[in-house]
C-alpha cells in the first residue's frame, strides 16, 4: 500500500491489524491472545510487503534479468516479523501503533517460532545471503524444502539431549503463500525403457512403473533493506498425486488406501533424517532429488515462458549448489535437456556446465556425500544412467590428460568402488568451484581436491563467507546499533565497510565506557534469559566466555569443558586462588545419531551440576548449557559475549560465521588459526585476538606421518591425567562410571577406524590453557579490554554477507542490480 504521511500510515496499519483480527479470529484486538495478535500484525505487515513483492517481479520480467537459484537443504531464517519491520524501515511506526493498542512488539516477536528450515552454519549462511541479495537488488530465488518439523527441538533432560519434534507450523505461517499453480511432479524408482522415436529415429528414455509425488511450492518474501526489493524463498512441500484410493479402502486395504499420502508426507517431515541405517539414507537422497527436481523444472518452465530458446538458459539462469546436497541438479538438468527438449548430449552438457556452480563447505571426508550405487540406481534410475555417462566421459578426459595414470582416475572418478561421489560430480560439471575462506580454499586446492585443481585450476576461487549486519547488529543488538549510528551515521547498515569510522573512538575513554556499558546491559539481558530458562544465577560482572555452534568433535567443545574441569580442580586445590569469575556458556545441537557428540553434551551438563552447586568456589566458575540453540536466542547471546570461542582443530573448519557475529558485537576471538579466524586476525591485529594451538599445516603433517601419541602427554602431565581420570572415576557420573568411558577412550586409544585423540585436544590443551590465562589478564585491564572489544566491531567491515554476495554476483553469477 502506498503510504503518504506518518499519520496516515499509522491509521491504515491500525485498521489493517483490527481487520485481520476480525477476519482470522472473529475477535477484537482487546480480546485477542498473544498468538492471535502476532498473526494479525504479521498479516498486516505482509500486506505492505506484497505490493513491493509484485513490483519487484514485474521489474525483473520487464528488464529480462538473469536470476540465481540458490539451492540449499537448509535455510536457517530465524524469526521473520522483526526482521521484516526493520528492513521495511517501519520499526518506529509499528512500535508506536502497537503501543497505542497496548501491545509490546518485543513480546509479540516472542510469539513467533523460529522457522525450522535449517540447523547450522550452512543454513544460516544461506539466510544471510538471501538478505544481502534483496538488499543489493540482485534477482534471486532461494530453493529448499518446507520441513514440517525441522531437525528437532532440543530438550535437556537430566543432562541428556532429547529430540522432540519442532512443530513450528502448528499455528500456520502467516508469511508463506502456497502456489499450487506452480506444482510439478517428481518421480522415484521404477525402471527406464528405451524406445525409438518414430519421427526422429532417436532413442527415447522413458521412466516406467515409478512412484511420484507432487512438489507444491510455498513462497516466503525476503525483504531488502529500505529499497522495496522483495526476493523469494521458495520451499517445496510434497503432496500425494492421488490422495486417497477409495477402491483399496472399500476392499479393507486401509494401508494401501493412504500409501501415496504417506510417501509424500515422509519426504518433508524432518531435516537430515538419521542416516545410520539404509532407510534414513534413502529418505535423504529422496529429499535431495525432490527439491532439486522441482526447483530445476520450475526454473526451466519460467525461462521458457519468457524465451522460446532453451539454448539461452545459461545467459538467464544460474544454479548455485550450496554444498553437495543439491548436486543431483547436474544430472536432473541433463535429463530435462536430453529427454524433454530432445537435445544431443554435447549441447545439453554445454548448457549444464555453463549453468551450475558449486560451493564446497567442508574438507571433512564424512560430509562429502557418497551414495551407495545400489541405492542411487534403484531410487533414481534415469539420473543414475546420466551420471554413469558423465562419469565415463569424465574418466576419458582424465585418461587423455594423464595417460597410464590409474591413480588419478581412481581418485577423481565420480562413480568408483560402489559409490557415487557427489562432490566429484559437482566439480566435473560446475563452471565454478569455490571455498568459503582463504585458508579453506588453499587446503582444497593443495590437499583435498588437489587432483581436480591441477586438472582444472580455472574453476577454483575463494569467496570468504559473511553475515548480515541487519540481523546480527541492527535487530539483535539494538542498543549497540543505536550507539554506532549516533557515532558515525547509519551508512554501515547497507555498507559495513563504513563501520571502520569507529576506529577513531577506540582510545576515547568516554566512548569506551559507553561501549562497555552497552555490553553490560546485554549481559544483564542474557543473565535474565539464563535464569528463566536454566534456573542458574550468573553474574553479569563475570567474563562471559561463549561457545555456541553445532556439536561436532572437530569444533572441540570437549577441549573447552576439559579446561573448565581443569580450572575447577585448580580452585579446589587452591581455594584462595585469585581467579576472575567466569561464566562458560555453551549452546549446541548434536545430530540425533551422533552418539559421542551427545555424550559431550551430557558431560557439559554434568560438570555444570557439580560446579554450579559447589559453594566452596564462591561462584568463580559457572557453566551454562543453553537449550535449543537457534537464531532467536543466538542474537541475545552474541550481543552479550565477552569472549568468542572458535577453537576447532586447525584445517577442519571451512570458515565459520559465528566468529564474525561475535566480532560484530565486540567479542575478541579466542581461537586457532583456522577458517575465517585467520582473516579476522588479519583485520584486528594479532594483539587483539588470543590465538593458540597447532597450525593447519602442523595438523596435516601429524595426520600424514602418524607421529602423535596422546598417551605421552597423559603420562607426562599430571593435571591432564587428573582431568581425564575424572571422566571415568565417577566425579561427574557417580551413578554410572562408564557414562563417559567412550570419550576417555577416544582421547587415548586408537581403534579400527580412528586415531587416538584425532582432533588433537590433548596436544593443544596447554596452549589453550595459556591463551585462557591471557584472556583473564587482558580482561582485568579495563581500558585495554574496552579498546580490544571496540576494535572487533570497528574492523568487521569485510565480514558482511553484502561483500560476499557482491563477489559472487560479479565473479560467478554475472547478475545485474535492479532498482525500483
Task: Pin down the residues of each PLM region.
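A conserved ligand/cofactor-binding region detector
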Residues: 1-820
Amino acid at each position: 500500500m502506498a503510504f503518504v504521511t506518518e499519520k496516515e500510515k499509522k491509521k491504515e496499519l491500525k485498521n489493517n491489524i483490527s481487520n485481520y483480527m476480525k477476519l482470522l479470529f472473529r475477535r477484537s484486538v482487546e480480546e485477542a491472545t498473544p498468538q492471535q495478535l502476532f498473526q494479525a500484525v504479521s498479516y498486516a505487515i505482509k500486506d505492505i510487503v506484497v505490493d513491493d513483492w509484485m513490483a519487484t517481479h514485474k521489474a525483473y520480467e520487464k528488464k529480462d534479468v538473469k536470476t540465481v537459484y540458490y539451492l540449499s537443504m537448509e535455510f536457517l531464517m530465524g524469526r521473520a516479523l522483526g526482521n521484516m519491520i526493520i528492513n521495511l524501515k517501519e520499526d518506529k511506526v509499528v512500535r508506536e501503533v502497537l503501543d497505542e493498542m497496548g501491545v509490546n512488539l518485543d513480546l509479540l516477536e516472542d510469539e513467533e517460532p523460529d522457522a525450522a528450515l535449517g540447523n547450522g552454519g550452512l543454513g544460516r549462511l544461506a539466510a544471510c545471503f538471501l538478505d544481502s541479495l534483496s538488499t543489493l537488488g540482485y534477482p534471486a530465488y532461494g530453493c529448499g524444502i518446507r520441513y514440517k518439523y525441522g531437525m528437532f527441538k532440543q530438550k535437556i533432560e537430566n543432562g541428556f539431549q532429547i529430540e522432540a519434534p519442532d512443530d513450528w507450523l502448528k499455528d500456520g505461517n502467516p508469511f508463506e503463500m502456497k502456489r499450487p499453480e506452480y506444482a510439478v511432479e517428481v518421480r522415484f524408482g521404477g525402471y527406464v525403457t528405451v524406445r525409438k522415436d518414430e519421427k526422429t529415429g532417436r532413442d527415447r528414455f522413458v521412466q516406467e512403473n515409478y512412484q511420484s509425488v507432487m512438489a507444491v511450492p510455498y513462497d516466503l518474501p525476503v525483504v531488502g533493506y529500505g529499497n522495496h526489493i522483495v526476493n523469494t524463498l521458495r520451499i517445496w512441500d510434497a503432496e500425494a498425486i492421488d490422495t486417497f484410493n477409495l477402491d483399496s479402502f472399500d476392499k479393507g486395504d486401509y494401508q494401501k488406501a493412504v500409501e501415496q499420502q504417506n510417501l509424500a508426507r515422509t519426504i518433508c517431515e524432518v531435516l537430515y533424517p538419521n542416516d545410520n541405517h539404509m532407510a534414513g539414507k534413502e529418505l535423504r537422497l529422496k529429499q535431495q532429488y525432490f527439491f532439486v527436481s522441482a526447483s530445476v523444472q520450475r526454473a526451466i518452465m519460467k525461462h521458457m515462458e519468457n524465451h522460446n530458446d532453451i539454448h539461452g538458459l545459461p545467459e538467464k539462469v544460474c544454479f548455485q549448489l550450496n554444498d553437495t546436497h543439491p548436486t543431483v541438479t547436474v544430472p536432473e538438468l541433463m535429463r530435462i535437456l536430453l529427454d524433454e527438449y530432445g537435445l544431443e548430449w554435447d549441447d545439453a552438457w554445454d548448457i549444464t556446465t555453463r549453468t551450475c556452480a558449486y560451493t564446497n563447505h567442508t574438507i571433512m571426508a564424512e560430509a562429502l556425500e557418497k551414495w551407495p550405487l545400489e541405492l542411487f540406481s534403484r531410487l533414481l534410475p534415469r539420473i543414475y544412467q546420466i551420471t554413469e555417462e558423465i562419469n565415463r566421459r569424465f574418466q576419458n578426459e582424465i585418461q587423455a590428460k594423464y595417460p597410464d595414470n590409474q591413480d588419478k582416475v581412481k581418485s577423481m572418478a565420480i562413480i568408483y568402488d560402489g559409490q557415487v561421489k557427489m562432490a566429484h560430480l559437482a566439480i566435473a560439471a560446475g563452471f565454478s568451484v569455490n571455498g568459503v575462506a582463504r585458508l579453506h580454499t588453499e587446503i582444497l586446492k593443495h590437499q583435498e581436491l588437489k587432483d581436480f585443481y591441477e586438472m582444472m585450476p580455472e574453476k577454483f576461487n575463494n569467496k570468504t563467507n559473511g553475515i548480515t549486519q541487519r540481523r546480527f547488529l541492527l535487530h539483535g543488538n539494538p542498543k549497540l546499533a543505536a550507539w554506532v549510528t549516533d557515532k558515525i551515521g547509519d551508512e554501515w547498515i547497507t555498507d559495513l565497510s563504513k563501520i571502520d569510522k569507529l576506529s577513531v573512538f577506540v582510545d576515547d575513554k568516554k566512548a569506551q565506557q559507553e561501549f562497555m556499558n552497552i555490553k553490560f546491559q546485554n549481559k544483564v539481558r542474557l543473565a535474565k534469559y539464563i535464569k528463566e530458562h536454566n534456573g542458574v544465577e550468573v553474574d553479569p560482572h563475570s567474563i562471559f566466555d561463549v561457545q555456541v555452534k553445532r556439536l561436532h568433535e572437530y569444533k572441540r567443545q570437549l577441549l573447552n569443558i576439559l579446561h573448565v574441569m581443569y580450572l575447577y580442580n585448580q580452585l579446589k586445590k587452591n581455594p584462595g586462588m585469585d581467579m576472575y569469575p567466569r561464566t562458560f556458556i555453551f549452546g549446541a545441537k548434536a545430530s540425533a545419531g551422533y552418539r559421542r557428540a551427545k555424550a559431550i553434551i551430557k558431560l557439559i551438563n554434568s560438570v555444570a551440576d557439580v560446579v554450579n552447586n559447589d559453594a566452596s568456589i564462591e561462584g568463580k566458575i559457572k557453566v551454562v548449557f543453553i537449550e535449543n540453540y537457534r537464531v532467536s536466542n543466538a542474537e541475545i547471546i552474541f550481543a552479550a559475549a565477552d569472549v568468542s570461542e572458535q577453537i576447532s582443530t586447525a584445517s577442519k573448519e571451512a570458515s565459520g560465521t559465528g566468529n564474525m557475529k561475535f566480532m560484530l558485537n565486540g567479542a575478541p576471538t579466542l581461537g586457532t588459526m583456522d577458517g575465517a579466524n585467520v582473516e579476522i586476525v588479519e583485520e584486528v591485529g594479532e594483539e587483539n585476538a588470543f590465538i593458540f594451538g597447532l597450525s593447519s599445516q602442523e595438523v596435516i603433517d601429524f595426520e600424514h606421518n602418524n607421529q602423535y601419541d596422546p598417551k605421552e602427554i597423559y603420562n607426562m602431565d599430571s593435571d591432564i591425567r587428573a582431568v581425564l581420570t575424572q571422566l571415568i572415576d565417577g566425579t561427574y557420573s557417580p551413578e554410572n562410571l562408564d557414562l563417559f568411558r567412550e570419550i576417555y577412550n577416544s582421547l587415548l586409544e586408537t581403534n579400527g577406524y580412528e586415531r587416538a585423540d584425532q582432533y588433537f585436544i590433548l596436544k593443544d590443551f596447554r596452549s589453550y590453557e595459556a591463551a585462557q590465562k591471557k584472556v583473564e589478564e587482558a580482561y582485568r585491564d579495563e581500558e585495554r579490554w574496552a579498546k580490544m572489544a571496540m576494535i572487533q566491531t570497528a574492523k568487521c567491515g569485510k565480514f558482511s554477507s553484502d561483500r560476499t554476495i557482491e563477489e559472487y554476483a560479479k565473479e560467478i553469477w554475472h547478475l545485474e542490480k535492479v532498482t525500483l
